[in-house]
Amino acid sequence: MNPPLPPRQEKFLLFTLAGIQFSHVLDFMIMMPLGPILIAEFGISTHAFGLLVAVYSFSAAASGLLGATFVDRFERRNLLLGMFALFGLATLACGLAPGYFSLLIARGFAGAFGGVMGALVHTMIGDAIPFERRAKAGSLVSAAFSVSTVAGVPVSLWLANLFNWRAPFIFIAVLVIMFAVAGWKLLPQLRHHLSAEKQRHPFAPMFNVLRDANHWRALAFSALIIFSGFTIIPYITVYSVHNIGISQHDIPLIYLAGGTATLITARLIGHWADARGKVEVYRRVAFAALLPLFVITHLTSAPLWLWVACTTLFFVLVSGRMIPAMAIITSAAQPRLRGTFMTLNATTQALAMGLATTLAGFIISQDEAGLIVDYSMVGYVAITANLVAIWFVGRIVMHKRH
């Protein structure tokens, strides 16, 4: 591990990484609320729109495999900022795309650079923050999801309605410039992982990671968590409108309430995990998440206040699992291979995300009245994956001194 940072510099590092992660998460999240606008603008089907979402995840998975061959060969800060700059250019290309296919290609590039970048953010936390504070530090960076939910979705819709669908992407590109400048000034160089011994084969770092059975267990655990969430998440909005009867105008309230709640609870869960033990806290939060996983997929009608309460509990607990889980996963890596491992983890998560969304799409259907059918079956799949993850986490060994 790199030498400990002074408290002030550690805070600068975490807030800067949180800003970079915010840009990345916001770029991914705005696609779903922009769906109706893009479908009308390009005259495409819902399936074609689904490709715009899926290409991001699968490109991130492919870039993760490629990134695993070189990520531990470079100093962390420079590689992160380089990927961040390319991500910003790809996002700007999304905003300037003249048609559907050019937007599809631009989304693929954004996913490719974003996939490596997201892994590097967690890698730098693992390299710079001691084990005893790692979950709390991770919760601060994970708060980017909550801020994106609270501010990103409403702002993206407001900009799109005020100008057009291109405005949110241009807005994110401006954010990238701001956070890239901050990163250049505030992020420390991290090169402790660099080995004096040169590895001949470009896939040597990946092979070294995959030789460790503990790494395989951590990757399987990561896939289970993502799979259990993303069988449900992509279809919550559609189910809310068509089955529960929530107005399209009230959908931002779901994200606002859920994001605000997770913004508060994320830090509390991170502190709790550092104090009581990451595995114990993960199991408790994941077990509690079984309730909203069941309710969200089985409730057939509800007033707005009750549905918002259910979805808020879903956001808090399902995303809350990720805070101790990411600390466990990061600590499972051999320190000298952490960059490669976290890149492979990002690939694993992206594949799990794409496969979960695809499987759920095969299970559910829409009847003649427009209602979503068999969403409850998707819930059972998610609950099963969550239960397996609760059992499986105990098999992962953490490197507590690094």
Regions found by a protein language model. Give the residues of each.
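A membrane-interface helix-boundary motif in multi-pass transporters
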Residues: 161-173, 362-384
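Extracytoplasmic gate region of multi-pass secondary transporters
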Residues: 31-32, 215-255
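Conserved MFS/SLC helix-loop-helix module at the cytosolic interface between two early adjacent transmembrane helices
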Residues: 62-101
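Cytoplasmic helix-loop-helix junction between adjacent transmembrane helices
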Residues: 106-147
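C-terminal transmembrane helical hairpin of 12-TM major facilitator-type secondary transporters
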Residues: 279-325
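Helix-to-loop junctions at the C-terminal end of transmembrane segments
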Residues: 64-75, 266-277, 364
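Juxtamembrane intracellular "pre-TM" segments in multi-pass secondary transporters
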Residues: 2-7, 188-219
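Helix-loop-helix hairpin linking two adjacent transmembrane segments in secondary transporters
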Residues: 140-187
